[in-house]
Regions:
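Generic short beta-strand segments
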Residues: 48-56
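Residues that act as N-cap/strand-start positions at coil-to-secondary-structure junctions
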Residues: 31, 76-79
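Short, structured secondary-structure boundary patches
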Residues: 41-48, 69
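Structural recognition of the beta-strand scaffold that forms the well-ordered cores
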Residues: 24-26, 45-49, 81, 92-95
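Noncatalytic regulatory segments and standalone regulatory/sensor domains
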Residues: 55, 60-76, 83-144
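Detector for Asparagine
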Residues: 20, 26, 41-43, 52, ...
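Cysteine-nucleophile protease catalytic domains, especially the papain-like/related folds used
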Residues: 1-44, 117-143
Length: 144
């Protein structure tokens, strides 16, 4: 597995090669409300959760990177694409590479997202690059 910074770097290289002006941005640390705001604006969001939203496995792998930094890998971490939500039903819709398109309880999804260090990456189209507020009043307007 890999985490958000590597995905952003790799995705941006690919997007630059395509020449369409899309950008990848690391949203790690942002609230679920911010992620839902991105989805509402047509921007797909890669999120880190646990496989099938199960409780996080406490077992971890530790190592030292070539730069001498400590690194940790959670065994049960998993990436899904957040692609929709229903506030009335309190659900999110994700595209999961293991399960396909699936709905999850929003509260459970948010909990698992937080357990895996609130990692997220958004892919933005050129027309959505202006007004890229995060954690602002604008977010509150779209997601209440």
């Amino acid at each position: 597995g890999c985490y958000a910074p590597v995905i952003v770097e790799t995705a941006q290289k690919y997007l630059d090669e395509q020449g369409n002006g899309e950008v990848a941005q690391n949203l790690t640390g942002c609230s679920l409300k911010t992620l839902l705001w991105e989805v509402a604006n047509g921007n797909p969001v890669i999120t880190w959760v646990t496989i099938n939203l199960t409780s996080r496995v406490e077992e971890r792998y530790y190592w030292t990177t070539p730069k001498g930094e400590d690194a940790v890998f959670l065994i049960n971490e998993h990436c899904v694409l957040l692609c929709g939500y229903d506030l009335n039903a309190n659900t999110v819709t994700v595209c999961d590479p293991l399960e396909g398109k699936i709905q999850y309880d929003m509260d459970k999804f948010e909990n698992r997202y937080q357990l895996v260090y609130q990692q997220a990456v958004v892919l933005r189209k050129p027309e959505s690059l202006t007004g890229t507020e995060t954690e602002t009043e604008t977010t509150e307007m779209f997601v209440q």
